[in-house]
Amino acid sequence: MAMKIRLARGGSKKRPFYRIVASDSRMPRDGRFIEKLGTYNPLLPKDSEDRVKMDMERVQHWLDQGAQPTDRISRFLEAAGHTPKKERANMKKAQPGKKAVERAEEKAAKASAAAEAPAEAPAAEAAAEE
């Protein structure tokens, strides 16, 4: 049985409240779970102690049993100092493409050439006046 430690949504419309649960990965998100491990209330301030509450003993038990935490639960465990921080893959989607990089280089080259040209012009005028 593939186990997950994940969030099960509760609360009302626009007022989310989550239970941290250990459940079979094939069950629905808010469906049947094996054990409630804690709570997460995103409406509380980030520095509040009541925002995330977990029974770390039971979480460790399920991790030892082979349960896989979801991304959000992994971040909670990292913040609690329970697991080491993972190196996350930075998405390349936000970086400019090849064409945009080429255009930026061309624009920078033109700007530097334009900056050099006016600097040479006054020197030529000074030589002509003498």
Swiss-Prot record:
InterPro entries: Ribosomal_bS16, Ribosomal_bS16_dom_sf
Region (Disordered): 80-130
Biased composition (Basic and acidic residues): 99-109
Compositional bias segments (type: Low complexity): 110-130
Signal sequence range: none
Any GO BP: translation
One Pfam family here: Ribosomal_S16
Gene3D superfamilies for the chain: 3.30.1320.10
Gene Ontology molecular functions: structural constituent of ribosome
Keywords, ordered alphabetically: Ribonucleoprotein, Ribosomal protein
Any one GO CC term of the record: small ribosomal subunit
Keyword Ribonucleoprotein: yes
Family the entry assigns: Belongs to the bacterial ribosomal protein bS16 family.
Name the record gives this protein: Small ribosomal subunit protein bS16
Gene name linked to the record: rpsP
